[in-house]
């Protein structure tokens, strides 16, 4: 999966804007004039821009632009200049931002008169200055509004809340995944498809159509499939060839669960070692699981079938109580393999020539 920039809306709304242009060799005066023109409609009051040598050896530019009215934009590329894209933040404490910019400048440009304001979203300097320190909620809201990717979001959190980042990183990673969900890559099936060589292939086809091939969510629950039979008959390869799936062998690991999968496969796991077997077999929706080394989470937002594969010596049905077996039979199509059956077609022999 690749990281998404998300379809959530970027929002920048402040009278104090802090910009960082990484790997930008332009002179501060040139960038300052361009920024001044960009915010012209909001009546710019002051700008300071400094060139800094970053630890990676590249030149970075830091700029603080103050306006009489709040700059308002939902375009994350609004401050792009000649292909250089900046990190955009509200300057919660303009005094501190200005001090930071003046720390070790290699080149510097200023224009206008600095307005010492510390509270974001003030605007209109005629109403006086405020020394109120921004709250955590205000800082976090600003980060959420300005971040355009998962790495940028986590980087901004790390800079603003270093202690929280170090001690509660898993929570910030969770929120980052919610704000910027991964884009599901196109599924390329690595498992070859084949026609099963079964005595009753029609029953399998009848199960496949509504449970695997028809993906329209009409609210109905799917039906699972249970296959029990000898080893080396192609059960696993056939089951894995049907499409995107969650695959579990030896144990069920919910930490790797993929919500975009069409179906689940439980392969060669004894009945007593399969947690949530009822939810899986019953194709239930929205149930809570407890991944090992992780926190509880809700999975399966829609009904998904599960294909259970078992060898004859690990037949689930032999381990069930009468009540469990009744539930199993009501929610599963059961296919018990006959001798000679395989889940792949025998190779076609070339025709022999008559002598």
UniProtKB/Swiss-Prot annotation:
Keywords, in A-Z order: ATP-binding, Covalent protein-DNA linkage, DNA replication, DNA-binding, Endonuclease, Helicase, Host nucleus, Hydrolase, Metal-binding, Multifunctional enzyme, Nuclease, Nucleotide-binding, Nucleotidyltransferase, Repressor, Transferase
Binding residue positions for a divalent metal cation: 52, 60, 62, 104
Active site annotation, chain numbering: 100
Function noted in UniProt: Essential for the replication of viral ssDNA. The closed circular ssDNA genome is first converted to a superhelical dsDNA. Rep binds a specific region at the genome origin of replication. It introduces an endonucleolytic nick within the conserved sequence 5'-TAATATTAC-3' in the intergenic region of the genome present in all geminiviruses, thereby initiating the rolling circle replication (RCR). Following cleavage, binds covalently to the 5'-phosphate of DNA as a tyrosyl ester. The cleavage gives rise to a free 3'-OH that serves as a primer for the cellular DNA polymerase.
Start and end residues of each stretch annotated as Transactivation: 252-270
Spans annotated as Oligomerization: 175-187
Presence of the UniProt keyword Repressor in the record: yes
Chief place of localization: host cell
Secretion signal, residue range per the UniProt entry: none
Record note on quaternary structure: Homooligomer. Rep binds to repeated DNA motifs (iterons). Forms the O-complex, which is a Rep-DNA complex involved in the initiation of RCR. Part of the C- and V-complexes which are RepA-Rep-DNA complexes involved in the c-sense and v-sense transcription.
Motif position, RCR-2: 60-62
Free-text comment on the cofactor: Divalent metal cations, possibly Mg(2+) or Mn(2+).
Cofactors required: Mg(2+); Mn(2+)
Protein name: Replication-associated protein
Location(s), subcellular: Host nucleus
Domain CRESS-DNA virus Rep endonuclease intervals: 11-114
Gene Ontology annotations of biological process type: DNA replication
Family to which this protein belongs: Belongs to the geminiviridae Rep protein family.
